[in-house]
Amino acid sequence: MSSAPQLLGDAVASAASSMLAALRPGAVTRVHKFGGSSVADAVRIRSLAPLVDDGADVRVVVVSAMAGTTNALVAMAEQAASGQDWSGEWSALRERHLATADEIDGDGRHGLRDAVARDFDGLRDDLLALASATGDTAPLVAQVHGTGELASSRLVQAALGGEAGGWQRLDAREVLVVHPGEMGVGVDWEASRERFADWRARQQPAAVVVTGFVACERDGRCTTLGRNGSDYSAAIFANLFDASELLIWTDV
């Protein structure tokens, strides 16, 4: 498997390139982004630690969902909305993530299994709500679609050492505000910078794992950046963290 980083691959929107150009050269922050194949199982997740141990003053890791997870979540949302049974797919995906949690946190010191189980309890509740919902279901659908990043970010945080090892976790929906744009989702930079500054002042992180793909609207409703949006997330957070470098890793 290759461990060579690819700087802003083809999947990144053109807007991401302009954001990187705006990064200040004097920053001492490095952002790493890992896609679904790089967090596909416990072995690959554990292999990330030496890649991000790069000597930067601030290290940021943006993660996608485990390989195949988003496709499964999209299918479950469609099944729920159309009145079909989604329980088998939910159980299988839950067990895959719990098994990975057990491999990473076998002694339970990070409380990883319980945290991931809560994510899937929330997914089940969202699917039940979606099955009976009327009107605008877009926020519910977005919550379902983004569950994979919530869980994978927990897995990666624990594998890197967890809070005891200095690694914090940021749910991007806490700070990243977006709106519909002419070429897809656009960033509300004013709102995002304000929320990010507040979060950073409280946390003062030197190492943080961030959920890719997910965001929120100004009214707090959950949304996403669209398929393959985690590269876009990485570019956005490189800007917010004033990073000197963004590395997008593939197939590690």
Feature-to-residue mapping (PLM):
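Nucleotide/pyrophosphate-binding catalytic subdomain
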Residues: 1-252
